[in-house]
Amino acid sequence: ISIIYKFITGSIPPKKELKDLPFRLQKINQNTINDSKSTNFHSLKFAICEASKIFKDFALILLGNPKKEGFKEIEISNPALVVICGKHKDEIFRCVKHENKVLCENLSLAIKEIKKANIKNILFSPGYPSGDDYINFEERGKAFSKLIERNFGT
Protein backbone atom coordinates (compact mmCIF):
# COMPACT_ATOMS: atom_id res chain seq x y z
CA ILE A 1 0.00 0.00 0.00
CA SER A 2 2.84 2.42 0.80
CA ILE A 3 4.31 1.90 -2.69
CA ILE A 4 0.98 2.78 -4.28
CA TYR A 5 0.63 5.81 -2.00
CA LYS A 6 4.12 7.02 -2.94
CA PHE A 7 3.44 6.45 -6.65
CA ILE A 8 0.19 8.44 -6.52
CA THR A 9 1.25 11.25 -4.18
CA GLY A 10 4.99 11.33 -4.66
CA SER A 11 5.55 11.20 -0.92
CA ILE A 12 5.95 8.61 1.82
CA PRO A 13 2.70 7.80 3.65
CA PRO A 14 2.37 9.16 7.18
CA LYS A 15 2.78 6.63 9.97
CA LYS A 16 -0.48 5.66 11.61
CA GLU A 17 -0.63 4.49 15.17
CA LEU A 18 -3.29 1.93 15.89
CA LYS A 19 -5.13 2.37 19.16
CA ASP A 20 -6.68 -0.37 21.20
CA LEU A 21 -10.44 -0.39 21.03
CA PRO A 22 -12.05 0.10 24.41
CA PHE A 23 -13.52 -3.12 25.77
CA ARG A 24 -12.01 -5.28 23.00
CA LEU A 25 -9.71 -7.73 24.80
CA GLN A 26 -8.71 -4.88 27.10
CA LYS A 27 -6.43 -6.04 29.89
CA ILE A 28 -7.56 -4.03 32.91
CA ASN A 29 -5.18 -5.62 35.38
CA GLN A 30 -2.78 -8.55 35.47
CA ASN A 31 -5.59 -11.07 35.90
CA THR A 32 -8.57 -9.59 34.07
CA ILE A 33 -9.58 -9.06 30.45
CA ASN A 34 -12.58 -6.89 29.62
CA ASP A 35 -13.98 -7.92 26.24
CA SER A 36 -17.40 -6.34 26.70
CA LYS A 37 -17.48 -5.57 22.97
CA SER A 38 -17.98 -9.30 22.34
CA THR A 39 -21.55 -9.52 21.07
CA ASN A 40 -21.46 -12.77 19.09
CA PHE A 41 -20.11 -16.31 19.14
CA HIS A 42 -17.18 -15.58 16.81
CA SER A 43 -15.78 -12.80 19.01
CA LEU A 44 -16.35 -14.97 22.09
CA LYS A 45 -14.48 -17.89 20.52
CA PHE A 46 -11.58 -15.59 19.57
CA ALA A 47 -11.44 -14.11 23.09
CA ILE A 48 -11.35 -17.57 24.69
CA CYS A 49 -8.50 -18.55 22.39
CA GLU A 50 -6.54 -15.39 23.26
CA ALA A 51 -7.21 -15.73 27.01
CA SER A 52 -5.99 -19.34 26.85
CA LYS A 53 -2.63 -18.05 25.59
CA ILE A 54 -2.34 -15.62 28.52
CA PHE A 55 -3.90 -17.53 31.42
CA LYS A 56 -3.38 -21.15 32.43
CA ASP A 57 -6.67 -21.14 34.29
CA PHE A 58 -9.52 -18.64 34.06
CA ALA A 59 -13.22 -18.02 34.56
CA LEU A 60 -15.43 -16.76 31.75
CA ILE A 61 -18.40 -14.47 32.34
CA LEU A 62 -21.26 -14.60 29.82
CA LEU A 63 -24.06 -12.04 29.74
CA GLY A 64 -26.58 -10.66 27.26
CA ASN A 65 -29.44 -11.64 25.01
CA PRO A 66 -28.88 -14.84 22.98
CA LYS A 67 -31.79 -14.09 20.63
CA LYS A 68 -29.54 -12.38 18.02
CA GLU A 69 -27.43 -15.55 17.87
CA GLY A 70 -30.58 -17.62 17.34
CA PHE A 71 -30.24 -19.37 20.71
CA LYS A 72 -27.42 -21.36 19.10
CA GLU A 73 -25.89 -24.15 21.18
CA ILE A 74 -22.21 -23.51 21.85
CA GLU A 75 -19.60 -25.77 23.36
CA ILE A 76 -17.00 -24.10 25.55
CA SER A 77 -14.04 -26.12 26.82
CA ASN A 78 -11.14 -23.91 27.93
CA PRO A 79 -12.25 -21.94 30.99
CA ALA A 80 -12.24 -23.72 34.34
CA LEU A 81 -15.57 -22.05 35.15
CA VAL A 82 -18.30 -20.39 33.09
CA VAL A 83 -20.41 -17.90 35.02
CA ILE A 84 -23.65 -16.93 33.30
CA CYS A 85 -25.45 -13.88 34.62
CA GLY A 86 -28.07 -11.26 33.89
CA LYS A 87 -31.69 -11.15 32.86
CA HIS A 88 -31.18 -13.70 30.06
CA LYS A 89 -29.11 -16.11 32.17
CA ASP A 90 -31.52 -19.05 31.89
CA GLU A 91 -31.65 -18.77 28.09
CA ILE A 92 -27.85 -18.58 27.87
CA PHE A 93 -27.50 -21.49 30.30
CA ARG A 94 -29.52 -23.69 27.92
CA CYS A 95 -27.32 -22.63 24.97
CA VAL A 96 -23.95 -23.29 26.62
CA LYS A 97 -22.35 -26.71 26.91
CA HIS A 98 -19.65 -26.74 29.61
CA GLU A 99 -18.90 -29.13 32.46
CA ASN A 100 -18.64 -26.38 35.10
CA LYS A 101 -21.18 -23.58 34.64
CA VAL A 102 -23.09 -21.58 37.23
CA LEU A 103 -25.87 -19.00 37.20
CA CYS A 104 -25.79 -15.61 38.92
CA GLU A 105 -28.33 -12.81 39.01
CA ASN A 106 -25.92 -10.06 37.98
CA LEU A 107 -22.33 -9.11 37.20
CA SER A 108 -21.50 -8.24 40.80
CA LEU A 109 -22.59 -11.67 42.03
CA ALA A 110 -20.71 -13.30 39.14
CA ILE A 111 -17.46 -11.76 40.38
CA LYS A 112 -18.21 -12.94 43.93
CA GLU A 113 -18.82 -16.46 42.57
CA ILE A 114 -15.43 -16.42 40.85
CA LYS A 115 -13.73 -15.23 44.04
CA LYS A 116 -15.49 -18.00 45.97
CA ALA A 117 -14.21 -20.55 43.43
CA ASN A 118 -10.70 -19.17 44.04
CA ILE A 119 -10.06 -18.54 40.34
CA LYS A 120 -7.69 -15.63 39.91
CA ASN A 121 -8.04 -14.89 36.18
CA ILE A 122 -11.20 -13.55 34.57
CA LEU A 123 -12.30 -13.14 30.97
CA PHE A 124 -15.41 -11.01 30.58
CA SER A 125 -16.47 -11.78 27.03
CA PRO A 126 -20.27 -11.76 27.11
CA GLY A 127 -20.78 -13.33 23.67
CA TYR A 128 -24.15 -11.64 23.19
CA PRO A 129 -25.62 -8.14 22.73
CA SER A 130 -26.35 -6.33 26.01
CA GLY A 131 -30.06 -7.15 26.01
CA ASP A 132 -32.03 -5.94 29.01
CA ASP A 133 -29.05 -5.65 31.37
CA TYR A 134 -27.19 -2.67 29.88
CA ILE A 135 -27.82 -0.02 27.22
CA ASN A 136 -24.80 -1.13 25.16
CA PHE A 137 -21.38 -2.80 25.36
CA GLU A 138 -19.76 0.45 26.55
CA GLU A 139 -22.00 0.79 29.60
CA ARG A 140 -21.53 -2.92 30.26
CA GLY A 141 -17.74 -2.63 29.94
CA LYS A 142 -17.55 0.36 32.28
CA ALA A 143 -19.70 -1.43 34.87
CA PHE A 144 -17.45 -4.50 34.73
CA SER A 145 -14.25 -2.44 35.05
CA LYS A 146 -15.65 -0.62 38.10
CA LEU A 147 -16.60 -3.91 39.75
CA ILE A 148 -13.13 -5.34 39.15
CA GLU A 149 -11.50 -2.22 40.57
CA ARG A 150 -13.76 -2.36 43.62
CA ASN A 151 -13.10 -6.07 44.21
CA PHE A 152 -9.46 -6.49 43.14
CA GLY A 153 -7.92 -3.08 42.45
CA THR A 154 -6.13 -2.24 39.21
Place the predicted regions along the sequence by residue.
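Nucleotide phosphate-binding/pyrophosphate-handling subdomain across enzymes
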Residues: 1-80
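Residue-level preference for the first positions of well-ordered beta-strands
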Residues: 57-59, 119-123
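C-terminal helical cap/extension that packs against the catalytic core
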Residues: 66-121
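Short glycine-rich anion-binding loops that position phosphate/pyrophosphate groups of nucleotides
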Residues: 39, 65-67, 88, 123-132
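Short, glycine/charged-enriched secondary-structure capping and boundary segments
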Residues: 47-49, 73-76, 96-98, 136-140
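Glycine/aspartate-rich loop-and-adjacent alpha/beta segment that forms the canonical ThDP
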Residues: 126-154
